[in-house]
Regions:
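Non-heme di-metal
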Residues: 1-119
C-alpha cells in the first residue's frame, strides 16, 4: 500500500466513524412524516420529482466511480458509503411526494419505469 493509499484509507476510517456517530439518519423514523405540508405547491413537488429522476441514475454513477477507484480500499469504500447516503435523499423526497399527496406510489413507479425505458 502506498503512502497515499494508506492516508486515504485512514481518512475514510475517520470519515466513517464520524458519520456513524453524528450524521446517520433514518428516512422512516427521523422525519416527522405526520407533519408533512400537504398544501405545498405543485412547483415544489415538481422540484422533488426532478431530483428523484436524476437520482434514479445513482447506481450508474456509483458503478462508474467504484470501477475507477476499485483498487484503493479507502476510496472504493468511501464511494460505496457516499452512495448509501445519497440514496436516502431520493428515498426521502419520494416519501415526501407520496405522504404529501402530491404523487401516488403508482405515479412514482411509473416515473421510474419511464426513465429506465430511456436507458
Amino acid at each position: 500500500m502506498s503512502r497515499l493509499e494508506e492516508r486515504l484509507y485512514r481518512e475514510y476510517l475517520q470519515f466513517f466513524e464520524k458519520a456513524e456517530a453524528e450524521r446517520r439518519w433514518s428516512v422512516f423514523s427521523d422525519i416527522p412524516w405526520e407533519k408533512v405540508n400537504r398544501g405545498a405547491s405543485e412547483e415544489l413537488a415538481l422540484c422533488a420529482e426532478t431530483f428523484c429522476s436524476v437520482e434514479m441514475y445513482l447506481p450508474d454513477y456509483v458503478a462508474g466511480g467504484i470501477n475507477v477507484v476499485r483498487d484503493y480500499f479507502g476510496q472504493a469504500w468511501f464511494q460505496a458509503n457516499w452512495a448509501y447516503e445519497e440514496s436516502k435523499h431520493s428515498l426521502a423526497l419520494t416519501h415526501y411526494l407520496v405522504k404529501s399527496g402530491k404523487r401516488s406510489e403508482e405515479q412514482m413507479f411509473d416515473l421510474q419505469n419511464r426513465i429506465f425505458a430511456r436507458k
